[in-house]
């Protein structure tokens, strides 16, 4: 197999990294932005959720666009948009971009909604590229490599942006976060996609061809599980740094260093989850249990570590437990996306948009709901809720059948 498809997979990983730098930049900058612009935690939670509202609403159109135009053009255009909107965010509070506290909140809500919409193509377009360029037997690991960019971007953001922020302010940190997006946008413009016929050396199975409908019970359960996974994962994307600083009382730089730990671990756990899933599929477990095993294990034990992190009084132990929970939550990404491809067939971009919309509906709720739960019930109980949701997400995989032979009954299920 040519190495060119895997070079494109690495560029997809770099694109995911750049997208997450633009996504989580406000979580870091928020430590100084909130007092500077007079925003409360609840207002900041709404701003975080505005990103996810735009991101979720545009998932399906973005997936359809990727199916029609291809990954290269869609991702190049999207990355240029991330740069432009992030620059406007850095100017928030200057001139006409918000002169009062209420106006400032509205400006940030609008800009975060727009950048969320602009980031919507990232993973549906990446899934469309992987489906076109990589044989099915290797799609678990390919998806794991791509989505490892989530961990890389999230790991880089706190330490790098905190250094920039402490020296030059939160506006400079936001601008710095957009530079990788500019680089990948230019890279996509100069990249040629391989010929599909030369890549698909392993033909899609008849099962995949027959199961292109997004109305199957398996696809609905897959999307529901990914929604619950998104609720848990986005707590760490948006609130972990502020949780460590404000609840566990670490200083800015130490909090930044510790908040990178989950993402450093996930750089390993995400591709590892895909590799393990591919090997289990190729081994005795077959397609059904081979794809189920990693999500069942990962989401269940993520819930266990969330509960341990919530109840410990030791701040350093909490960092370790919650970092392990994050790594396990994200280790399931490869199996989720590979299973979606096995169900969706040629409609991978659209199906990826539907599934990714689900996880971002969960992510839309958690950044806004978590500080409310923390304010009324305490952070411990807010994390207990997340632990229960993670275990529920794992249990849904018992009803997901990537292959017809693994379906719970011989009759097709639709909803």
Locations of the language-model features?
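Cytoplasmic helix-loop-helix junction between adjacent transmembrane helices
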Residues: 111-150
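Conserved MFS/SLC helix-loop-helix module at the cytosolic interface between two early adjacent transmembrane helices
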Residues: 57-100
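Central cavity-lining transmembrane alpha-helices of secondary-active solute carriers
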Residues: 49-63, 260-273
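Extracytoplasmic
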Residues: 7-41, 236-241
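Extracytoplasmic gate region of multi-pass secondary transporters
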Residues: 26-27, 217-271, 333, 337, ...
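Flexible cytoplasmic inter-helical loops of multi-pass small-molecule transporters
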Residues: 189-209, 406-412
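Helix-loop-helix hairpin linking two adjacent transmembrane segments in secondary transporters
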Residues: 146-193
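Structural signature of the two symmetry-related core transmembrane helices
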Residues: 73-88, 288-306
